[in-house]
């Protein structure tokens, strides 16, 4: 089994997930359920014997809080953590902070669906998934992947769309395929990589 370990975790449920709001770069914390999800992720990783050498996180509170709870469960609170805006959620621009139902009333269901689920169409003032990939992928290639290939066991805690961008590259998925991929909050996805950075194995640690 490969020692080139990469674990991806979407943050626990956020306050705005619960309220059905577009969040993007807005900065709500996680809910009580989100706290439970993060702690559960940490317990599952600990039960499987995971110990990490490197940790990466976005600049947003919901991801940072999730990672801190995971590391607490692992007894690794002293592990250095690198945070970067490159791992932030997709910026929803003018949709940020709006209730998703209200947005559908304002712009129409079809238009909002296009903004949410097309690869290269951005909402007003915001990013498409393609835009998100354009900032997330270089950071992965330059900052995260080299350590993984050296055998550093690495955890990345981020967001639905920034993680979709990484998964698209890791699993060599088409834009159509990645847009259909739903990522549960607080569920670790375990990748073991080959020396050429392709995926040897993948496991969802749902418990």
UniProtKB/Swiss-Prot annotation:
Catalytic activity: (2R)-2-phosphoglycerate = (2R)-3-phosphoglycerate
Positions bound to substrate: 10-17, 23-24, 62, 89-92, 100, 116-117, 160-161
Keywords: Gluconeogenesis, Glycolysis, Isomerase
EC category name: isomerase
GO terms for biological process, alphabetical: gluconeogenesis; glycolytic process
Location of the active site: 11 (tele-phosphohistidine intermediate), 89 (proton donor/acceptor)
Annotated site, Transition state stabilizer, chain positions: 159
InterPro entries assigned to the protein according to its UniProt record, in alphabetical order: His_Pase_superF_clade-1, His_PPase_superfam, PG/BPGM_mutase_AS, Phosphogly_mut1
This protein's pathway: Carbohydrate degradation; glycolysis; pyruvate from D-glyceraldehyde 3-phosphate: step 3/5
Keyword Isomerase: yes
CDD domains for this protein: HP_PGM_like
UniProt keyword Isomerase, yes or no: yes
EC number: 5.4.2.11
Domain of life: Bacteria
Molecular function GO terms recorded: phosphoglycerate mutase activity
Protein's job: Catalyzes the interconversion of 2-phosphoglycerate and 3-phosphoglycerate.
Family stated for the protein in its record: Belongs to the phosphoglycerate mutase family. BPG-dependent PGAM subfamily.
Assembly behavior: Homodimer.
Protein name: 2,3-bisphosphoglycerate-dependent phosphoglycerate mutase
Species for this entry: Afipia carboxidovorans (strain ATCC 49405 / DSM 1227 / KCTC 32145 / OM5)
């Amino acid at each position: 089994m490969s020692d080139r370990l990469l674990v991806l975790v979407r943050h626990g449920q956020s306050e705005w997930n619960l309220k059905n709001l577009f969040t993007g770069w807005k900065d709500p914390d996680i809910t009580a359920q989100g706290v439970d999800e993060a702690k559960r992720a940490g317990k599952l990783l600990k039960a499987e014997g995971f110990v990490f050498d490197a940790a990466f996180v976005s600049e947003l509170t919901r991801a940072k809080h999730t990672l801190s709870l995971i590391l607490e469960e692992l007894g690794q609170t002293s592990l250095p953590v690198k945070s970067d805006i490159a791992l932030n959620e997709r910026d929803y621009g003018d949709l940020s902070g709006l209730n998703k139902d209200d947005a559908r009333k304002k712009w129409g269901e079809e238009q909002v669906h296009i903004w949410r689920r097309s690869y290269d169409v951005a909402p007003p003032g915001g990013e498409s998934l393609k835009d998100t990939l354009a900032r997330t992928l270089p950071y992965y290639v330059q900052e995260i992947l080299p350590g993984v290939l050296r055998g550093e066991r690495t955890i990345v805690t981020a967001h639905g769309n920034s993680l979709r961008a990484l998964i698209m590259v890791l699993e060599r998925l088409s834009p159509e395929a990645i847009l259909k991929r739903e990522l549960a909050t607080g569920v670790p996805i375990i990748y073991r990589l080959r020396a050429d950075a392709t995926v040897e194995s993948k496991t969802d640690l749902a418990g």
